[in-house]
Amino acid sequence: HYRNVDRHDVMTDPHILSMRIDESLYFANAAYLEDTVFAQAALREDLAHVILMCPAVNAIDLSALEALEEINTRLRENDIALHLSEVKGPVMDALERSDFLNHLSGEIFLSHHHAVMALRTRETADPALI
């Protein structure tokens, strides 16, 4: 299980930032999402991956899609990949109708655990073996 690092004594990975989104994404919270992702990313010198965990996101509007595009672009400019996990069907449908997935620097994972395990494996892999 993945827990709030401010409330629980948990292990973290310096290369991975996991953020859980607890509501639908729309114009009223899109800028807050951007600001929060960038603020947290700035605190991690060795960051390579940001995973937005989306099990509570039931809907997404155009403003939020634009925010995700901006997050993806700015992270990519800093060699950080953006990934999504646990995306619900209707939200995935909206992402597929947009151009966002064509530019996503990372991947979409069915489960958050799978995302973390896959990305940790990549970060710890011996470059000589790849």
Question: Where are each of the predicted segments found?
Answer:
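Structured cytosolic domains appended to multi-pass membrane proteins
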Residues: 2-130
